UniProtKB/Swiss-Prot annotation:
Protein name as catalogued: DNA repair protein RecO
Keywords for this protein: DNA damage, DNA recombination, DNA repair
PANTHER family to which the protein is assigned, alphabetical: DNA REPAIR PROTEIN RECO
Tagged with keyword DNA repair: yes
Recorded GO CC terms: bacterial nucleoid
Keyword hit for Acetylation: no
Function: Involved in DNA repair and RecF pathway recombination.
Length: 248
């Protein structure tokens, strides 16, 4: 029997029995963890209020087998709020749908429980903080998060040099299968020709150039979002359910 303590973001919850929940948390040190939180569905449970999606929490787990992941679900025995990001997200539809897509993305990229994913965790914390504060348009924050999640998981798209031969850009064509922009010599079936403004926007979102991103016209934002969605779908092998609800 062992106790484990970690920081984490609550990704989702599901009912268990009459009063309990299974909590899925992306933690800093142990990756994605599922744990049982007892009694949290009772009306007066302050413990349960801290374990809602979007919450950044300091949690304690009790594992009977001595390992946090492997022999049945551990118990979540204690939680303290670090930052209640949900308060600045759930009341606004655009923020809520963008945030839900961010949580789903983080879970999809951490499909092996118990494997540390520190970069993904830090991206999620930063993304939810920015979203809750309303620092930029929700759909831009989401696209930046999606691009950076792809990058930290080894799928960074190229928006300048040819993704196949490395020919210096700018290059005209874009292929999700090839890994981003490609030159005329490397053009493959299914390539598209996005606007230069859309590619500039995506490059800015990936690098954190918010001045450029915030100034982009709505039509180029929609175009860029379509490219991000297609690229993410290709690498995850299926789309995100929550993306269909995001307002662009």
């Amino acid at each position: 029997m062992s106790l484990f303590r970690d920081d984490g973001i609550v990704l989702r919850t599901q009912k268990l029995g009459e009063a309990d929940r299974i909590i899925t948390i992306l933690t800093r040190g142990h990756g994605r963890v599922r744990a049982v939180a007892r009694g949290v569905r009772r009306t007066k449970s302050k413990f349960g209020a801290r374990l809602e999606p979007f919450s950044h929490v300091d949690v304690q787990f009790f594992a009977r087998g001595g390992e946090l992941v492997g022999r049945g679900l551990p118990l979540c025995t204690q939680s303290e709020t670090i930052a209640p990001y949900g308060g600045g997200i759930v009341a606004d539809y655009a923020r809520y749908t963008a945030g839900t897509a961010m949580l789903e993305t983080a879970e999809r990229f951490t499909d092996h429980e118990g494997e540390p994913a520190v970069q993904q965790y830090l991206l999620l914390v930063g993304g939810l903080r920015t979203l809750a504060r309303g620092e930029h348009a929700p759909h831009l924050i989401l696209d930046a998060f999606l691009l950076r999640s792809l990058a930290v998981n080894g799928y960074a798209p190229s928006f300048e040099d040819c993704a196949k031969c490395g020919m210096p850009g700018p290059n005209r064509f874009f292929s999700v299968a090839a890994g981003g922009v490609i030159c005329g010599d490397c053009r493959v079936p299914g390539s598209v020709v996005p606007s230069a403004q859309a590619l500039t926007l995506l490059s800015a979102l990936l690098s954190g150039d918010w001045a450029t991103a915030d100034a982009c016209e709505a039509r180029h934002v929609r175009e860029g979002s379509g490219l991000v969605s297609a690229y993410l779908h290709w690498h995850l092998e299926r789309g995100l359910r929550s993306l269909r609800y995001v307002e662009k």
